[in-house]
Amino acid sequence: MERIFKTVDDSRAETVYLVRPTHLNGANRLFGGILMQWIDEVAGIVAKRHCGGNVTTASVDNLTFLHGAYQNDMVVIKGKLTWVGSSSMEVCVDTYVESPKGERHRINNAHFMMVALDENDKPMHVPGLKLQTDDEHLAWQHGEERRRIRMQRLKDKLDGI
C-alpha cells in the first residue's frame, strides 16, 4: 500500500484560553501543570488530525517556561507537526500571551512525541509529512536530531538497567 502524505498545514491547531483565578498558583501566576495540560491537548489535536485516529503522548522534550501568565491574560497555544516516523509524530507547541491589541509574546515552548494507536491501542502507521517550505525542512532536520538524542537517552537508560 502506498503511503499517504499530508502537509503541516493540514493538522495545525490553535486555541485560546483566558486565565481564571482557578488556574493560578500561590504566586498568582498560571499554574505550570494547567499549562502542561493545555499544551498536551493541543499536541494531541495536531497528531489526531494528522493520523486520523487515537494518539497517546509518549514523551515531552524541552518543555521550557520562558515567562509567566497572569489572571485575565489570553493564552494562545499553537501546535504544528515537525517530524513523523512510521507510527510516531513530533509536535512543536508554542504558547503566547496575547495583549488586547493582538500583540503576542512567547511564554512557553515544547516538543511532544505522539504515537498513533489503532482500535487495539497498538501503534499504527501514520501518513508521511509533505514539507513545503524552507522552515518546514529545517524543523524536520531539528526533529531528526531530537529523535537521535531521544533514542540515545533511551539506550543509555536501558543499558543502566
Predicted features, each with a name:
Residues 1-161:
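Terminal targeting signals and extreme-terminal segments of soluble enzymes
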